[in-house]
Amino acid sequence: VESALGLTLELDDLSKRLGAQDILGATWIQSKTVVIDQSLEPSENPAMEGRFNFTLAHEAGHWVMHAHQIADIPEQATLFDISTAPSIVCRSSQRKDSMEWQADRFASYLLMPEDRIRSYWREIRGGLDQYMAFEEIEAIKAQSEYPIPVTQVAKDMAEHFRVSGQAMQIRLEGLKLILAEQPEPDLFSG
Protein backbone atom coordinates (compact mmCIF):
# COMPACT_ATOMS: atom_id res chain seq x y z
CA VAL A 1 0.00 0.00 0.00
CA GLU A 2 2.76 2.39 0.89
CA SER A 3 4.94 1.82 -2.16
CA ALA A 4 2.28 0.77 -4.71
CA LEU A 5 -0.24 3.51 -3.91
CA GLY A 6 1.95 6.12 -2.23
CA LEU A 7 -0.05 5.99 1.00
CA THR A 8 1.16 6.22 4.56
CA LEU A 9 0.05 3.31 6.74
CA GLU A 10 -0.44 3.75 10.48
CA LEU A 11 -1.75 1.62 13.32
CA ASP A 12 -3.65 3.38 16.09
CA ASP A 13 -6.45 2.98 18.61
CA LEU A 14 -9.17 4.27 16.29
CA SER A 15 -11.90 4.11 18.93
CA LYS A 16 -9.91 6.49 21.10
CA ARG A 17 -8.70 8.64 18.19
CA LEU A 18 -12.14 9.07 16.62
CA GLY A 19 -14.34 8.71 19.69
CA ALA A 20 -16.44 5.84 18.35
CA GLN A 21 -16.49 2.07 18.79
CA ASP A 22 -15.94 -0.75 16.28
CA ILE A 23 -13.84 1.22 13.77
CA LEU A 24 -11.54 -1.11 11.84
CA GLY A 25 -9.95 1.32 9.40
CA ALA A 26 -10.05 4.92 8.23
CA THR A 27 -8.66 6.84 5.29
CA TRP A 28 -7.63 10.48 5.16
CA ILE A 29 -7.68 11.39 1.47
CA GLN A 30 -5.94 14.78 1.67
CA SER A 31 -2.96 13.46 3.63
CA LYS A 32 -2.88 10.09 1.80
CA THR A 33 -3.04 8.22 5.11
CA VAL A 34 -4.65 4.88 5.95
CA VAL A 35 -5.01 3.97 9.61
CA ILE A 36 -5.88 0.45 10.73
CA ASP A 37 -7.06 -0.19 14.28
CA GLN A 38 -4.23 -1.48 16.44
CA SER A 39 -6.39 -4.37 17.69
CA LEU A 40 -5.93 -5.95 14.24
CA GLU A 41 -2.11 -5.73 14.28
CA PRO A 42 -0.96 -9.25 13.34
CA SER A 43 2.29 -9.34 15.30
CA GLU A 44 0.39 -8.43 18.49
CA ASN A 45 -2.74 -10.43 17.69
CA PRO A 46 -1.96 -13.25 15.21
CA ALA A 47 -5.58 -14.43 15.18
CA MET A 48 -6.53 -11.13 13.53
CA GLU A 49 -4.12 -11.41 10.58
CA GLY A 50 -6.90 -12.22 8.13
CA ARG A 51 -9.04 -9.31 9.32
CA PHE A 52 -6.01 -6.99 9.17
CA ASN A 53 -5.20 -8.03 5.59
CA PHE A 54 -8.80 -7.62 4.45
CA THR A 55 -9.18 -4.24 6.18
CA LEU A 56 -5.96 -2.97 4.59
CA ALA A 57 -7.08 -4.18 1.14
CA HIS A 58 -10.51 -2.64 1.78
CA GLU A 59 -8.96 0.76 2.57
CA ALA A 60 -6.77 0.44 -0.55
CA GLY A 61 -9.99 -0.17 -2.45
CA HIS A 62 -11.40 3.09 -1.14
CA TRP A 63 -8.25 4.86 -2.28
CA VAL A 64 -8.28 3.37 -5.79
CA MET A 65 -12.02 3.72 -6.39
CA HIS A 66 -13.21 6.64 -4.26
CA ALA A 67 -10.37 9.07 -3.54
CA HIS A 68 -11.05 11.11 -6.68
CA GLN A 69 -14.74 11.43 -5.79
CA ILE A 70 -14.03 12.63 -2.27
CA ALA A 71 -11.14 14.88 -3.30
CA ASP A 72 -13.46 16.63 -5.79
CA ILE A 73 -15.77 17.80 -2.99
CA PRO A 74 -14.82 21.48 -2.39
CA GLU A 75 -15.26 21.34 1.39
CA GLN A 76 -13.19 18.17 1.66
CA ALA A 77 -9.86 19.88 2.31
CA THR A 78 -11.18 21.77 5.30
CA LEU A 79 -13.68 19.19 6.53
CA PHE A 80 -11.36 16.19 6.48
CA ASP A 81 -7.94 17.18 7.60
CA ILE A 82 -5.67 14.61 9.32
CA SER A 83 -6.12 16.46 12.61
CA THR A 84 -9.90 16.10 12.37
CA ALA A 85 -12.16 13.46 10.91
CA PRO A 86 -11.10 10.97 8.25
CA SER A 87 -12.65 11.04 4.79
CA ILE A 88 -13.77 7.42 5.09
CA VAL A 89 -14.47 5.46 8.28
CA CYS A 90 -15.08 1.70 8.13
CA ARG A 91 -16.85 -0.01 11.02
CA SER A 92 -17.40 -3.67 11.70
CA SER A 93 -21.11 -3.14 12.44
CA GLN A 94 -21.76 -0.61 9.70
CA ARG A 95 -24.56 -1.19 7.24
CA LYS A 96 -22.91 -1.38 3.85
CA ASP A 97 -23.47 1.55 1.50
CA SER A 98 -22.32 1.31 -2.12
CA MET A 99 -18.80 2.62 -1.38
CA GLU A 100 -18.31 0.06 1.41
CA TRP A 101 -19.66 -2.74 -0.76
CA GLN A 102 -17.32 -1.72 -3.59
CA ALA A 103 -14.30 -1.60 -1.26
CA ASP A 104 -15.20 -5.06 0.09
CA ARG A 105 -15.45 -6.40 -3.46
CA PHE A 106 -12.08 -4.82 -4.35
CA ALA A 107 -10.43 -6.43 -1.30
CA SER A 108 -12.03 -9.77 -2.08
CA TYR A 109 -10.81 -9.80 -5.68
CA LEU A 110 -7.34 -8.59 -4.68
CA LEU A 111 -6.76 -11.11 -1.87
CA MET A 112 -8.79 -14.02 -3.25
CA PRO A 113 -8.59 -13.99 -7.06
CA GLU A 114 -11.01 -16.41 -8.69
CA ASP A 115 -8.39 -18.43 -10.57
CA ARG A 116 -6.32 -19.01 -7.41
CA ILE A 117 -9.42 -19.84 -5.37
CA ARG A 118 -10.62 -22.38 -7.93
CA SER A 119 -7.12 -23.88 -8.25
CA TYR A 120 -6.74 -24.33 -4.48
CA TRP A 121 -10.33 -25.62 -4.19
CA ARG A 122 -9.50 -28.25 -6.81
CA GLU A 123 -6.29 -29.14 -4.95
CA ILE A 124 -7.93 -29.67 -1.55
CA ARG A 125 -11.32 -31.00 -2.73
CA GLY A 126 -10.22 -33.08 -5.71
CA GLY A 127 -12.35 -31.18 -8.21
CA LEU A 128 -14.60 -28.18 -8.65
CA ASP A 129 -17.78 -29.79 -7.34
CA GLN A 130 -19.95 -27.51 -5.27
CA TYR A 131 -20.01 -28.17 -1.51
CA MET A 132 -23.57 -28.51 -0.22
CA ALA A 133 -22.99 -26.81 3.13
CA PHE A 134 -26.53 -26.21 4.34
CA GLU A 135 -26.43 -28.90 7.06
CA GLU A 136 -23.06 -27.71 8.38
CA ILE A 137 -24.27 -24.10 8.29
CA GLU A 138 -27.46 -24.92 10.20
CA ALA A 139 -25.37 -26.68 12.88
CA ILE A 140 -23.04 -23.66 13.12
CA LYS A 141 -26.00 -21.26 13.38
CA ALA A 142 -27.39 -23.31 16.26
CA GLN A 143 -24.11 -22.97 18.19
CA SER A 144 -23.02 -19.45 17.23
CA GLU A 145 -24.22 -15.89 17.24
CA TYR A 146 -22.06 -14.78 14.30
CA PRO A 147 -24.12 -13.34 11.44
CA ILE A 148 -22.21 -15.31 8.80
CA PRO A 149 -21.53 -18.95 9.69
CA VAL A 150 -18.13 -20.13 8.46
CA THR A 151 -17.73 -23.70 7.22
CA GLN A 152 -14.62 -25.74 7.91
CA VAL A 153 -13.55 -25.69 4.25
CA ALA A 154 -13.79 -21.87 4.28
CA LYS A 155 -11.66 -21.74 7.45
CA ASP A 156 -9.05 -24.01 5.84
CA MET A 157 -8.93 -21.92 2.69
CA ALA A 158 -8.88 -18.68 4.70
CA GLU A 159 -5.74 -19.83 6.47
CA HIS A 160 -4.06 -20.54 3.12
CA PHE A 161 -5.02 -17.13 1.69
CA ARG A 162 -4.41 -15.29 4.99
CA VAL A 163 -7.87 -13.75 5.14
CA SER A 164 -10.67 -14.11 7.67
CA GLY A 165 -12.95 -17.11 7.56
CA GLN A 166 -15.92 -14.81 7.08
CA ALA A 167 -14.34 -13.14 4.03
CA MET A 168 -13.53 -16.54 2.53
CA GLN A 169 -17.02 -17.88 3.22
CA ILE A 170 -18.56 -14.93 1.38
CA ARG A 171 -16.15 -15.34 -1.54
CA LEU A 172 -16.77 -19.09 -1.86
CA GLU A 173 -20.52 -18.59 -1.78
CA GLY A 174 -20.18 -15.82 -4.37
CA LEU A 175 -18.23 -18.16 -6.64
CA LYS A 176 -20.92 -20.82 -6.09
CA LEU A 177 -18.35 -23.25 -4.70
CA ILE A 178 -20.31 -23.41 -1.45
CA LEU A 179 -24.07 -23.74 -1.50
CA ALA A 180 -25.27 -22.31 1.81
CA GLU A 181 -28.99 -22.97 1.43
CA GLN A 182 -30.80 -26.08 0.39
CA PRO A 183 -32.27 -25.61 -3.07
CA GLU A 184 -36.03 -25.66 -3.47
CA PRO A 185 -37.28 -29.01 -4.72
CA ASP A 186 -37.71 -29.11 -8.47
CA LEU A 187 -41.11 -30.37 -9.56
CA PHE A 188 -39.65 -32.01 -12.64
CA SER A 189 -36.57 -33.71 -11.19
CA GLY A 190 -36.48 -37.04 -9.65
Per-region residue spans from a language model:
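Active-site hotspot residues in diverse enzymes, especially metal/ion-binding acidic/histidine motifs
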Residues: 1-190
